[in-house]
A protein has these predicted regions:
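OB-fold and OB-like single-stranded nucleic-acid-recognition modules
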Residues: 1-136
């Protein structure tokens, strides 16, 4: 059964805390660098706006999918495992989503996944935040 949705202390709190640190960004800078250098397996966090929602990927583990636009204009696919974490209900274009996950390079802009807890405890836990709720 997916993990319980947690109430975030404030919407996008972790992203806001990261952005408040000297030299930190909303995650767009690190993702842009990983894309330019074609790096994968990069732990990232920040926030972006939903550019487009996509049908769920139902092959293998089920994933809620959407395209997110970052503050620098780059778009990335978010693939959120809904077998391990709750789906974000009523997600719409223009919504702000905070994230912590792993970036994987592809020529279309990349993918952010591992936006959930790791039941085996071998990988950094990730999450998504939407309207004050954390999904992990």
């Amino acid at each position: 059964k997916p993990a319980v949705v947690e109430q975030a202390r404030t919407p996008h709190q972790n992203a806001a805390q990261a952005a408040a640190k000297p030299g930190a960004t909303d995650g767009a800078e690190l993702i842009a660098q990983a894309f330019a250098e074609q790096h994968s397996d990069v732990q990232v966090s920040g926030s972006g706006k939903v550019h487009r929602t996509l049908p769920d990927d139902t092959q293998g583990s089920r994933h809620q999918r959407f395209i997110m636009k970052l503050s620098n204009g780059q778009t990335v696919l978010v693939a959120h495992n809904i077998d391990l974490a709750p789906r974000i209900p009523r997600l719409q274009r223009g919504d702000t989503v905070g994230f912590s996950g792993e970036y994987e390079y592809n020529a279309q802009g990349g993918v952010i996944h591992w936006t959930h807890h790791d039941p085996a405890g071998r990988h950094a836990d990730g999450w998504l935040e939407h309207n004050g709720q954390r999904y992990q």
